[in-house]
A protein has these predicted regions:
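Gly/Ala-rich beta-loop-alpha elbow adjacent to hydrolase catalytic centers
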Residues: 1-7
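Short alpha-helix in the alpha/beta-hydrolase fold that links the catalytic acid
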Residues: 71, 80, 94-103
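Acidic catalytic loop of the alpha/beta-hydrolase fold
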Residues: 89-93, 121-122
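Hydrolase active-site cap/lid region
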Residues: 9-64
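C-terminal alpha-helix
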Residues: 134-138
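Active-site nucleophile elbow and catalytic-triad environment of alpha/beta-hydrolase enzymes
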Residues: 58-74, 80
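Short beta-strand/loop motif that positions the catalytic acidic residue
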Residues: 77-79, 84-86, 90
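Catalytic histidine-centered segment of alpha/beta-hydrolase-like enzymes
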Residues: 118-129
Length: 140
């Protein structure tokens, strides 16, 4: 998920011609969204006050807001092809985040792979050879 976020954050920037496409596997929309989701899912806690306090701390100590760290905003600017991959049973990054990211990507140069029953980072293992066939087909 962190590699996917890094990929998507880069996708919205000017990249060299050698970068021809982006592939993300089990990525999240933003730091704010994933932290909020985890608070609810793991601890049954609302966003307020913890998220707001932690965000204020990040702003003062690190110089950025959790809402600024948004893969979603970067994907909206991506012009190169992008492949989105996610497992339906991911209990860390909600599967719905892939759909949000996919819809945000402009143009038709995008594809998605859904891995039924796959947990976080398990799509490659559950789909096996099909995973790699789809990835290499996308890159062609």
């Amino acid at each position: 998920s962190m590699g996917a976020a890094t990929t998507m954050m880069t996708a919205g920037e000017d990249t060299p011609d050698q970068v021809v496409a982006f592939i993300e596997d089990c990525g999240y929309t933003s730091v704010w969204d994933i932290f909020s989701s985890e608070l609810k899912l793991r601890f049954g806690m609302p966003e307020f006050p913890l998220m707001y306090t932690a965000n204020l701390f990040a702003i003062t100590k690190a110089g950025y807001s959790f809402k600024e760290a948004s893969a979603l905003n970067q994907v909206k600017k991506c012009e190169k092809p992008m492949l989105f991959i996610h497992g339906t049973a991911d209990d860390f990054i909600p599967y719905e985040m892939m759909d949000i990211l996919y819809q945000a990507k402009p143009g038709d140069n995008k594809e998605k792979i859904t891995a039924p029953g796959a947990g976080h980072g398990e799509a490659m293992y559950l789909l096996g050879e099909e995973y790699w066939d789809d990835v290499f087909t996308f890159l062609e």
